[in-house]
Each structure stands twice: as structure tokens, then as C-alpha cells.
Amino acid sequence: MLIKHNIVALLAFSFMASATAAEFSIGAGAVYNESPYRGYNDNVHAVPLVSYESESFYFRQTTLGYILSKSESNEFSITASYMPLEFDPGDNDDHAMKKLDKRDATAMAGAAWYHHERWGSVKVSAAADVLDNSNGWVGEVSLFRPMPMGKLTLTPSIGVLYYDENFNEYYYGISGNESRRSGLSSYSPGDSWT
């Protein structure tokens, strides 16, 4: 498979509303995605941005969390999230890629730790595929800093993502059977950092 770099640009405009010690925000964004799969068209999607924060639960992007421990500077939670990565050979324009197996989106479960300081926040998380599509897991270490600007909040971040070998094999590998059907070379990726 020809693997391209994912480019995601997110422009978010949100507002905050408070209700009994919980915070809810809603907004709209745009996501540009250059597909990692050859034969897919680049696309832009409008996406709703919904966030909910309470003392015990949160919903951030595609992740639901239950907070086990929280202090002024630390938060530890268990998480469940949606991993939207998928491949549908029927939607592909490339003849060889149409002969590969379908890869499904999945659900992930894991844990996250946030450490908050005045200069920003650090996130460390890990999650595993609970639907056994890939039997893989992913990890993240990132630094972010919300920057309120009136009713708009911009949150720049930088980080490192880890994908284990099973995750990469499922989403990006080409098995021997797929190679024979498609004429593409078999491919077995290892783990990766991005």
C-alpha cells in the first residue's frame, strides 16, 4: 500500500455554557484528510465539536472518560473512544486496492492521565482495540495549552503517537492472500511513532 501522510487541519469555534458544576461546549469544525490509502480521494468534512465536562465524566472529541482521581493539577481516568480509521475497497479508485480486505473502524478502551500547570497541560494515554479488529493498541504523549479569546478558545498542541505492530498490520498491512489477489507486494509493518 502506498501510505501517505495524514494531514488534519481543524478549525474550531466554540462557546461555553455552564450548568450545575458541568461545562458544555458545542461548535463546528472542518477536517481535511489526505487518505493514507492509494486510490482514495482527499476529502474535507464538516464536523460537530461537542465537549462535556463534569466532576466524574467527560466527553472530549471522540472520547468518553470516567474520572477516577482528580486534583487541581492531576486527573486520571478510564476511557472509551471511537477510532474512525477504516478502509472500504469498494470506495477506492485503484484496481489493485479494490481487491484488499475491508478494514473496520473500532472502539478503544484505556486510561488517560492529565497534568495541568499554568504553562499548559500534559496528556499521557494508552488504549486497546476492544472489538478485536486489530488486537492492537495506541499511546499518546502530548502537550497542549488552551488559549481563550473571548468566546473562542484555540488549543494548539504538539505530541507523539505510538501505534503497535498489530494495529499497523490490520490497517496498513497486505497479507499473502491479499497480495495474490491484488498483485501488490505483501507488506507487514512494525510499530510506529508519529
Predicted regions and their residues:
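Cleavable N-terminal export/targeting peptides
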Residues: 1-25, 39
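Outer-envelope beta-barrel architecture signal
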Residues: 22-26, 44-46, 55-57, 72-76, ...
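Membrane-embedded beta-strand positions of outer-membrane beta-barrel proteins
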Residues: 26-28, 50, 61, 76-80, ...
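Residues on the lipid-exposed face of transmembrane beta-strands in outer-membrane beta-barrel proteins
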Residues: 28-32, 48-54, 66-68, 111-115, ...
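Transmembrane beta-strands of outer-membrane beta-barrel pores
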Residues: 30-36, 54-56, 80-86, 117-119, ...
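Extracellular loop and loop/strand-boundary signature of outer-membrane beta-barrel proteins
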Residues: 34-36, 95-99, 126-130, 181-190
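Solvent-exposed loop/turn segments connecting transmembrane beta-strands
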Residues: 36-42, 70, 103-105, 127-138
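Outer-membrane beta-barrel transmembrane domain signature
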Residues: 130-194
